[in-house]
Each structure stands twice: as structure tokens, then as C-alpha cells.
């Protein structure tokens, strides 16, 4: 029963989404019903794609026409020339760059633009960034000044009453360490803000970790919810798979030891996790922020969580997914040494992994309707499914290549090949065989044998390869005999070729 399902899935996945094809095939009781539904959907999708293509062409032509019209209008406008302001300047400035900056930042003074351009050594991009920052600072200062004016005007009489002097507690004269000073800065801005909801807090934490570790937010989302919303375990797993840890050398590791030791001493976390966080964040303040997040969340959410080499085991479904993912990472990488059977087996395994990831993506998408953070996890699973699909296609192609080079120079076994693959292989092998045998005498030609099988593994136990290869050889004007799942090619059928030319 699985043969016709696999054949329909393989054929219609080229025109429709593979997850949709898989669902229709699994819901159908017989091949005819499934084929009718899939055929109708494929025809409809092809028609839609053609209509969409023409709509896109018309839209692109209209946009191009609008852009040309806009360019013509802009070119008619005379640009103002500011280069006369450089006559009395002692700075060596590029007139073209200055003219562009002056026209873009007309609200800033000429002296400010000249100083910034000289500081950036006539670099247009750096100068633009510097001037944009200056403009933003000016606007923020104006807003703060207006706010202070409003607050000052509302100060009452009681605010000017004399306050009693209170003695400040005398602090020890011991100098603050680097960690202590940075800890005070981190504590001024709490990691988990009580005024925000749990969802908002998690969203802000994910954005912060994305900027520090340079990891996609979808991957952090997936890891966070896979570990039951526990930040300590999530951070440990992200750090463990982070790229810089695999590229670090012993000399570079020694540079981080002093700061990591201080972090471990003051946070109470292990030296290993402190070192790994410091290497991945590549900044002391960022590492301190991540460690404070671990410390705070393990106290508030998880209790006494120890970041050891072994974390708590997930449930049975998570274990199954992890085993399948580990299995996919251990698949053979020496592609050229694989046989056709091995390539087909690997392709089937990758297709199973693809279907599992698509199923997980659908589940996470349904959950995202109540919690938007699951949307990133759904995207992550969908991306994994696409990667597994590409790998399955790759190994399927390798299987066809291996099959094409199998057998001897005068024989070919097509077991395991699809009709399309078999046609390509037969054409190549028969052409190569005839190139060697064409110059020999007709009585000395050694025939070429093609084994197609009797169709015992086809849908409905009907042979498909044999009729397809027979039609192909007839079209290419070969002389052959076909019987009992085997085709013997003797050479070119010259009479058939002459009749077709006539």
C-alpha cells in the first residue's frame, strides 16, 4: 500500500507543496482518488502561477515607467551649489561629497558639516552616519529640555522646604573591582521588568541575546520553548553550540581566564560556563548581563539549577526528535563512495526527517495563535524541513549518478530508478556503448543488455520501466528485442531511420 503513496508523493511534490501532497495521499483510501485530487490541484496551481507571472510582469513594467518619470522630474530640478562655502576653508574637502552632505543636512551649520567631513576623511558613508547621530542627539536634547521646562513650572512651594541633613554611610576605601562596578550598572536596569508581562519580558530578552550572540531569534525561540521556558538551560545549550567555541585556540583561551575567574568568583557559577559565555559574547559587560540573567532566572523560576555537563532529560517525544536529528548529523559525508542503494536509503531517511519537521512546524504554528513566540519556532522547523528536502533531492541525484555508472560496458540494471531517471541513464549508456561498437563489423557487435524488471514492485504490479524504455528506443531508432523484463539492443535500425527521414 505504501508503494503507490510514495510514487504519488514523489511525482506531485514537484508541482505542489510536499506537506499538502503527503496529507492528501495519507487521507485517501485508493490511488485513483488521490491522483484525481492531486491532478486537479496541480493544474490549478500551474494556471495560478502563469496568471501571477503575467501580473508581476505588468506591475514591473508600470513601476519601471513610474521610476523613469520620477527620474525625469528629478533631473529637471537644479541642485543648489554649496561649494562656494569652501573658498575660505583651510580643510582639504572633496567638493562633491560636501555638496551632497550640505544639501542633505541643510538644517546643520556649514562649519559642523565641514568638521565632520574632515574628521571622516571625505568618506561619504561615515560622514552621513556621524551627521545623522548629531541630528538625533539634538532632537533628543530638545525633547528633554521641553520636558524639564514643564516639570519645573509645576513645582510646588513644599518642594523648596529645607530638608534635614542625613549622614551617609561611610563606605570602605577599598577600590571597586571591574566586576563590582559593572554589576552596579547592570542592577540599575533590572533584567526582568515587573511592569511588563511575561511575554514582553521574554521578547526583550530574546532580542538582547540575538544582538549579543549573533544567533537568529527563531533559533533562540525554539530552544527556549523546547526547554520548558527555562533560561539557564536554554543559554547553556545555545552557548554549547555556538561557533566561536569550536574555533578557539589555547592561546586565546588563556586571555579570558582572568576575567572568567573573577566572574565565577562573584556570581557563584562554574568557571566553565563563565568562560564559555565570555568567549561567545566577546565582551565583559555582555557576558556579565548573560550571567546575571542565568542567576536571576534560576533563582526565580527554576530554583537551584546547576549548569553541569548533563541537563535534565526531556520527555519521550523530545528524545525521539533529538535522536533523529543526531542520526541525520551522523549520515555519511563521503558522497562519492556511496552506492545507489545507500543513496536511496539516505534520501528516504531525509524525507522522514523532512516530514517530521513539517509536522512540528504545523503544531508550532497552531500554538502561535495563542502565543506569538511560537511563530519563530514554527519558522525554524519549516527551515529545517526545507534543508532536509534539499538533502533528500541531493542523495536521490547521487543515486541516479551511481546507477548510471553501475554494471558493465555492455549491461545496465535499472532496478530502483524512476521512469524519468531511467530514460536519462539509458540514453547516456546506449550512446556510450554504440560509440565503441559502431566501427566493428555487424557480426562482431556485442549487444547491450538492459534489465528493467517485470514490475513486481510497481503500483498495481504493472511494469512501467519496460514500456517506457521500449518507446524511448523506438523513438531513437534502435534495433532491439524485449522480453521477460530485459531489453537487448543490437544497433541502429537504419530502415526505420530512412523511413522517418523520407
From Swiss-Prot:
InterPro entries: Endo/PolyKinase_Domain-Protein, Smr_dom, Smr_dom_sf. One of its GO terms (molecular function) is endonuclease activity. Residues 411-459 form the Smr domain. GO terms for cellular component: cytoplasm; nucleolus; nucleus. It comes from the Eukaryota. Residues 157-171 have a biased composition (Basic residues). Residues 150-184 are annotated as: Disordered. Its main location: nucleus. It is found in: Nucleus, Nucleolus. GO terms for biological process: nuclear-transcribed mRNA catabolic process, no-go decay. Keywords: Nucleus. PANTHER family: NEDD4-BINDING PROTEIN 2. This is Smr domain-containing protein C1235.03. It comes from Schizosaccharomyces pombe (strain 972 / ATCC 24843) (Fission yeast).
Amino acid at each position: 500500500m505504501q508503494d503507490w503513496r510514495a510514487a504519488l508523493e514523489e511525482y506531485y511534490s514537484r508541482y505542489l507543496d510536499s506537506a499538502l501532497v503527503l496529507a492528501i495521499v495519507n487521507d485517501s483510501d485508493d490511488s485513483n482518488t488521490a491522483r484525481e485530487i492531486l491532478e486537479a490541484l496541480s493544474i490549478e496551481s500551474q494556471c495560478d502561477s502563469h496568471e501571477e507571472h503575467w501580473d508581476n510582469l505588468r506591475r514591473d513594467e508600470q513601476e519601471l515607467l513610474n521610476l523613469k518619470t520620477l527620474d525625469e522630474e528629478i533631473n529637471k530640478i537644479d541642485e543648489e551649489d554649496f561649494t562656494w562655502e569652501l573658498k575660505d576653508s583651510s580643510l582639504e574637502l572633496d567638493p562633491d561629497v560636501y555638496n551632497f552632505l550640505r544639501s542633505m543636512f541643510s538644517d546643520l551649520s556649514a562649519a559642523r558639516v565641514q568638521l565632520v567631513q574632515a574628521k571622516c576623511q571625505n568618506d561619504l558613508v561615515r560622514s552621513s552616519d556621524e551627521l545623522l547621530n548629531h541630528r538625533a542627539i539634538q532632537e533628543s536634547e530638545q525633547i528633554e529640555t521641553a520636558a524639564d521646562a514643564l516639570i519645573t513650572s509645576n513645582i510646588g512651594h513644599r518642594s523648596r522646604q529645607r530638608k534635614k541633613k542625613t549622614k551617609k554611610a561611610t563606605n570602605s576605601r577599598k577600590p571597586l573591582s571591574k566586576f563590582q562596578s559593572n554589576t552596579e550598572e547592570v542592577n540599575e536596569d533590572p533584567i526582568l521588568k515587573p511592569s511588563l508581562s511575561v511575554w514582553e519580558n521574554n521578547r526583550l530578552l530574546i532580542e538582547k541575546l540575538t544582538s549579543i550572540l549573533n544567533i537568529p531569534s527563531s533559533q533562540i525561540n525554539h530552544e527556549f520553548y523546547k526547554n520548558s521556558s527555562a533560561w539557564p538551560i536554554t543559554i547553556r545549550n545555545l552557548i554549547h553550540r555556538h561557533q566561536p567555541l569550536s574555533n578557539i585556540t589555547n592561546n586565546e583561551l588563556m586571555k579570558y581566564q582572568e576575567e572568567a575567574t573573577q566572574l565565577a568568583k562573584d556570581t557563584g557559577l562554574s568557571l566553565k560556563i563563565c568562560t564559555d559565555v565570555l568567549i561567545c559574547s566577546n565582551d565583559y559587560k555582555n557576558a556579565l548581563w548573560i550571567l546575571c540573567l542565568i542567576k536571576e532566572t534560576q533563582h526565580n523560576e527554576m530554583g537551584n539549577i546547576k549548569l553541569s555537563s548533563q541537563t535534565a532529560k526531556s520527555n519521550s517525544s523530545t528524545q525521539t526528535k533529538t535522536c533523529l536529528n543526531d542520526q541525520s548529523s551522523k549520515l555519511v559525508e563521503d558522497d562519492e563512495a556511496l552506492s545507489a542503494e545507500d543513496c536511496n536509503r539516505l534520501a528516504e531517511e531525509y524525507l522522514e526527517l523532512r516530514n517530521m519537521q513539517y509536522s512540528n512546524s504545523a503544531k508550532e504554528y497552531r500554538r502561535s495563535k495563542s502565543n506569538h513566540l511560537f511563530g519563530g519556532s514554527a519558522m525554524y522547523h519549516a527551515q529545517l524541513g526545507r534543508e532536509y528536502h534539499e538533502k533528500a533531492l541531493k542523495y536521490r541525484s547521487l543515486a541516479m549518478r551511481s546507477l548510471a555508472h553501475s554494471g558493465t560496458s555492455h549491461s545496465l540494471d535499472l532496478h530502483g530508478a524512476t521512469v524519468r531517471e531511467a530514460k536519462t541513464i539509458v540514453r547516456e549508456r546506449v550512446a556510450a556503448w554504440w560509440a565503441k561498437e559502431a566501427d566493428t563489423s555487424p557480426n562482431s557487435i556485442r549487444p547491450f543488455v538492459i534489465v528493467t524488471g517485470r514490475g513486481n514492485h510497481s503500483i498495481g504490479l504493472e511494469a512501467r520501466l519496460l514500456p517506457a524504455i521500449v518507446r524511448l528506443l523506438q523513438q531513437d531508432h534502435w534495433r532491439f528485442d524485449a522480453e521477460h523484463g530485459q531489453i537487448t539492443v543490437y544497433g541502429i535500425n537504419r530502415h526505420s531511420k530512412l523511413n522517418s527521414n523520407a
